[in-house]
Amino acid sequence: RQRQMCIRDRPSENEVDEYYLTGWEGNPLSSFAGLLNITQVHDVVVTGEGTLDCDAQNGDWWVNPKVKRIAWRPRAVAMVDSENVCLHGITVQNSYSWTIHPIFVKHLDLLNFNINNPYNAPNTDGIDPESCEYTRIIGVNIHVGDDCIAMKASKVFLGMKLKKSCEHTVI
């Protein structure tokens, strides 16, 4: 049996998803789907010793990163409007942009895993919880060239509509 699994992917620019998997400054944005997309689900556990490798360094995701190409760069792990989600023991690396971006997630556990992105990769934050409740970030090793953890309260469109910040967070 294989003890370690490595998932690699390079999303095609022709694959456009109609869901909003990400946002920027509180505005929902269209983006390409990342390797792991958790949307409107509950009771999800992703655990093990495997690696989610976005392999972004071998594509053109970091060339002109502020230019939209059909849709914006994906997050490695996108979570939207979900509840009771746990990531445990995995490694996530070489993200296209922000590595883990939960939006409106309740009861989120990010436990004992690794995030590895090159120090010169543009805007590849580690973890960016946005408007989440009851979040625990414990034992996570983050090696990136940008923000390790950036707590966000949706502003602009979502902030004006929902007035929701991050609450009850343990780091």
Spans of model-derived segments:
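Right-handed parallel beta-helix
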Residues: 42-51, 83-94, 106-117, 125, ...
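Extracellular beta-strand/beta-solenoid scaffold signature
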Residues: 15-36, 60-77, 94-98, 121-128, ...
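Short, charged, surface-exposed secondary-structure boundary motifs
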Residues: 8-15, 111, 160-161
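Ligand-site clamp/hinge motif
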Residues: 80
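Sequence/structural signature of small/polar-enriched beta-strand/turn repeats
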Residues: 37-38, 52, 56
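Short, small-residue-biased leader/transition segments that mark boundaries at the very start
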Residues: 2-7
